[in-house]
Regions:
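C-terminal engagement/docking regions of AAA+ P-loop ATPases
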Residues: 3-17, 24, 259-340
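Conserved C-terminal "switch" segment of AAA+ ATPases
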Residues: 19-27, 40, 179, 193-265, ...
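Pre-Walker A (pre-P-loop) alpha-helix and adjacent loop at the N terminus of AAA/AAA+ ATPase modules
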Residues: 23-66
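Conserved alpha-helical scaffold flanking the Walker A/P-loop in AAA+ ATPase domains
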Residues: 50-53, 107-128
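Walker A/P-loop
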Residues: 55-93
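Conserved beta-strand position immediately N-terminal to the Walker
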Residues: 61, 127, 165
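P-loop (Walker A) phosphate-binding loop of NTP-binding proteins
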Residues: 66, 100, 170
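Canonical AAA+ ATPase core
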Residues: 107-112, 131, 135-139, 147-237, ...
Length: 340
């Protein structure tokens, strides 16, 4: 769903007037953010839209796509446009938890030796966890704690991460050798799973011209980190219609085999989404409405975000693999079935 600006209504109530101003600011900032990222990234409009939603909701996002589709460039461009500190961790089989979180090191001060904490690369506002499924479960667990608690624990001491703190991870869907399956608990911590597809023929021509011209366009700064935090604090206050909440809950519950009347769910899903799916979907719908400049999130916003908010929370059966049924097929079937 493409994002566009829409009119809003100003009211005499001071609190509502402030929210109306923030709504306009959010819509304008996101339009400028898309333009800034578009100066570097060709196409991928839907991907950019979904990552902006993740940013506004303070959520983590999992980007799935084959190598060479500019996933790293996209995330780093977002960080530059938002003036956020950026960290990249290349996940490998020999990566240790301390390589991510940091470690205590022995230092000498005033003639005395003491342990001091040396922060790892995760102590940034926006962290790219590249090929997250290439590292063992122990290291994945360290990242999970940081994503969940926005803090890391080393040597019995807890160190808070900077605010905002968000993880955008990547996963290569075609290489399985030497990889470790992401546990459901970790997948559930991602607000959205965003699939990055191949560019169109015309977009690929533009990419070929732009990347071989010898020049590298700069990404303009759109927002400062404190301005982003202000917009993030505003998103939960965006109104949402009862129909939208009802649809989000029904869609989530319809992914569970014991409760669903969908043949696709009963035949191909072992476990459906938990309540966190409903929460992520409603919050994403609020962000989507704010980006478009709408005063309240509605059914259309829920439908637009249903696939990225729910697909990674489904555990498909072996039969689904045999029959070639994907998570997107199941979510599409559920969307057709559920009405409000």
């Amino acid at each position: 769903m493409m994002l566009s600006c829409a009119p809003f209504t100003v009211t005499s109530d001071p609190a509502k007037s402030q929210d109306a101003a923030l709504l306009a600011q959010t819509s304008d900032a996101c339009a400028r953010l898309r333009q800034a990222v578009g100066s570097v990234i060709v196409g991928q409009d839907a991907v950019v839209d979904h990552l902006i939603v993740a940013l506004l909701t303070q959520g983590h996002a999992l980007l799935v796509g084959v190598p060479g589709l500019a996933k790293t460039l996209l995330v780093s461009s977002l960080s530059r446009a938002l003036d956020l500190s950026f960290g990249r961790v290349q996940f490998t089989p020999d990566l240790l938890p301390a390589d991510i979180t940091g470690t205590d090191v022995l230092t000498e001060r005033d003639g005395r030796r003491e342990l001091s904490f040396l922060p790892g690369p995760i102590f940034k506002n926006l962290v790219l966890a590249d090929e997250i499924n290439r590292t063992p479960p122990k290291t994945q667990a360290a990242l999970l704690q940081a994503m969940q608690e926005r803090a890391v624990t080393v040597g019995g001491a807890t160190h808070p991460l900077p605010a905002p703190f968000q993880v955008f991870a990547t996963r290569n869907p075609i290489e399985q050798e030497g990889t470790y399956a992401l546990p459901e608990a970790q997948l559930d911590r991602f607000s959205l799973e965003v699939h990055v597809e191949y560019p169109s023929e015309e977009e690929e021509r533009k990419i070929a011209r732009r990347t071989t011209s010898g020049s590298s366009p700069e990404v303009a700064r759109v927002l400062a980190a404190d301005e982003l935090r202000m917009l993030q604090a505003f998103i939960p206050r965006v109104p949402v219609t009862e129909q939208a909440v009802e649809l989000a809950v029904r869609l989530t519950r319809a992914t569970r085999p014991a409760e669903s009347s969908s043949a696709e769910v009963k035949n191909y899903v072992r476990f459906g989404s938990g309540p966190r799916g409903s929460q992520a979907l409603v919050l994403a719908a609020k962000a989507n409405a704010a980006i478009r400049g709408d005063a309240a999130a509605d059914v259309e916003d829920v439908l637009a975000l249903a696939l990225p908010a729910l697909r990674h929370r489904l555990v498909l059966s072996y039969r689904a693999e045999v029959d070639g049924v994907k998570d997107a097929d199941v979510v599409a079937a559920v969307k057709k079935l559920v009405k409000v």
